Amino acid sequence: MAKSCQTHSRCKTSENSSNQASARAPCASFRLRPGAAAIAVFFVLWLLPTVCRAQSRDVVCREGVGDFEAEFLTGVRVRVGPARFGDLESRVCAAALSWGDQNLVIGDSAAQADVDAFGVDLGLGAPVAALQVKKSKGECCMEYRIYSLRAPPVLLHTIRGGEFFSAADTDLDGRVEIWTDDAASVEGFENLRLHDLDFAPPMVLRFARGRLLNASSEFRSFYDQKIADERAKLTAQDLGDFKNSDGRLAPATALPPGWPLRLRSVKMRVLEIVWCYLYSGREEAGWRSLAEMWPASDLDRIRAAILSARVRGILSQLDGISVPVSAGGKNHAKIFDGTVIVSATPGLTPKGVKPKQEITPPKAILMERPPPVTAVEIELAQSESTLKLVIDSAGKVRSVEVLGAVQSVDAGLVKSTANWKFIPAFSNGEPVASQIFLGVSLKR
């Protein structure tokens, strides 16, 4: 049974909105006071340990476990949770949008269903709900379905073939990207399954004027880190032995004991390095790296196979390539302060005037963390941690800071925030970036 942590919203109160009390002040155990408004109350689940790579991403509902419901200001509601057959919940997931007495079923018997974004501007001209659905447990990939949140909701776009999808304003420049991978194109490639790979080819997408564009080349530092990580796992001996093989590594190939598994790992990492170059828009560097590391006798075959696989994947669904914005031309999204509560000042605030909060604060969609393992980790997890989060306009955590006089940091909790999902803050009906305080403690 999953354990959970309870979280309490942390808010600064002030006599007026100009109060600038330090955000770094130590935070004691939080209790709601009469008249004080909390940003939100959340629960953080401890995930059961798993070795399955495909389950490394957090989703709202997996095999009938987990649920989420929310309503947008237009009256359109979303529900993701266990599918119901009569009065019974099943081991599959359902997702639906509803408005008034109408209902739009997105999936009613899926292995996984998830809300990635809700009320977010993806560049399609309307606030949207982005849901991802995996139809069966044996399938490799998700379908990413984007619906308008105007009544009645309309399916605006579907992207197929990624193992996961995650919308985020990565650089806090006001533009939202969709991070995914080209998993469907490489599933079974060279007899390698997705669970054999460290990662499928990463991709970064972005909508502009309704067109789905490839923005991967704008995030080359991300790809460079992936390349460096894979190169660090290879030795000169590994590469030399692989270069002297036939490249195919067919089961019937005569190799010394232990070599097939080792060379298979080398082959996998060489492919991952080449993919990172190719998918980040550096084809010349990719083909050069392939020639340096792949057996010469098999080079033409593998190059043709890579090209053939790419045209079957997400690349075939794109409308073009995003044009990078120069560093000097980039906007910087305003980060609204959700740590201050504006309250009436006795004797100064006119009667009948209610102070207005600058933003509608974020609300959690999904917050999960892996279980602590060691005694020290368990002790840290049982104590309250106070976090300062910056949440972007797509509802993803862009930065996290542990507040207070803490001796040790719960590293597992901090790391897990990278996969947390929120309905973003809103200002004047528009999704915005915000910063909030969040107190997290073990639910008792």
What does each model-identified segment do?
Residues E89-C93, K137-R145, E187-M203:
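Structural motif
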Residues V120-Q132, S136, D169-W179, G429:
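Acidic, glycine-anchored loop motifs typical of Ca2+
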Residues A54-R77, G81-R84, T180-H332:
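Acidic, small-residue rich beta-repeat scaffolds with periodic aromatic anchors
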